[in-house]
C-alpha cells in the first residue's frame, strides 16, 4: 500500500498505526477511549473505503512533537525558560537544542509564543525563526541568547519550540466515500490534524482539534486543523 499526502513532507515511509483500507460498511466504536501513539506516525488512515465511520475516540501522542517552554525571565540580551524534561526530552549539543522522541531527534527551527492566561498567540509573533545558543542553568532552567522582550513576550508566557518539518497528519482520508468522524478529538499531530483528499461525502460532527485536558499544553496541530484537497460532496 502506498500513498502521497498533499502539502506535507514526502518521507519514504508513512508509518500507519490504524489502517482502515478496502473496507465497506464498517463502524469503529471507541467508547470514549484515548489512543496514545508513540513516535512520528500517522495514527488513523481511511483509504479506498466506503461508508466507514469512526466514533467516540481521542488521538494523542505520548511525546508531543513540539516542546513547550515557560518563560521565567526576559531582558535585552537573554530569555530564560523552564522545560519539563520528562514531558519533553532533549539534549543540549554544541549549545543547541536537540529534541528527542521515540525513534527521532531534531533540532529547533522556530517557535510560537502563547500568552499567559488567554492561551492566544501573541500578536505579531507568528513563527519566530531561531536556532541559537542555549546555556543550561541547572534543574529545568535554560538561558537562551535571544531577546524576546522586544517581541512583547513576558514571564509566564509559553514558547512552543519546533522544527519546520511536517511529516505526518493525525488522520488521513484518501480515496474514500461516505466517511464520517463522530466525536473524534485530535489532540496533537506533526503535520495537519485532519487531511481529506481525493474523497467525497465526508462528514464530521463533534470532537475537533483541541488540547487534551490535564496535559497543560497550549499547542495542538503542526499545521492546519483541517485540510481538504480534491474533495467533493
Please tell me what each predicted stretch does.
Residues 199-233:
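Long amphipathic alpha-helical scaffold regions
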Residues 27-30, 52-56, 155-156, 178-183, ...:
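All-beta strand scaffolds that present successive hydrophobic residues in beta-strands
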Residues 77-86, 123, 132-149:
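Generic recognition of long tandem-repeat/solenoid scaffolds
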Residues 2-27, 36-55, 62-84, 164-176, ...:
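Extracellular beta-strand-rich solenoid/capping regions of secreted or surface-exposed proteins
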Residues 28, 66-76, 112-114, 119-138:
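Short, exposed beta-strand/loop patches in secreted or surface proteins that constitute
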Residues 146-150, 187, 192-195, 203-206:
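Charge-rich, low-hydrophobicity low-complexity segments
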Residues 58-60, 87-127, 148-170, 176:
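Extended Gly/Ser/Thr-rich low-complexity repeat segments
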